[in-house]
């Protein structure tokens, strides 16, 4: 199967725009279709890879919800919060936890040109207290 030069150039241009300095860390998403929707959003925004903390070590996505995004966004599975945070910080990422507390600040007040990781909590409970204590900044 051959690919038309115009289509090849378009695919190449999209892949060249992927942002390796932007990622997300998702903590214990309960429903696979929600993780799939996050991957689809990452793909649309040009995020190169996403990170997931799963205590059960089972990462499931729904193809119908992800619409093929799982092929283009690398999904890194972390066994626990500590290894996830260590890995991202060792790669130079600053972690912004999406939670509303007394220390949260408006997300629009930051320069995101450096390595940035948005940390998202589970649908029912949001971020765990353990993870909130490890992020660099809470944002809303």
Language model features with spans:
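Post-transcriptional modification and biogenesis factors for structured RNAs
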Residues: 1-140
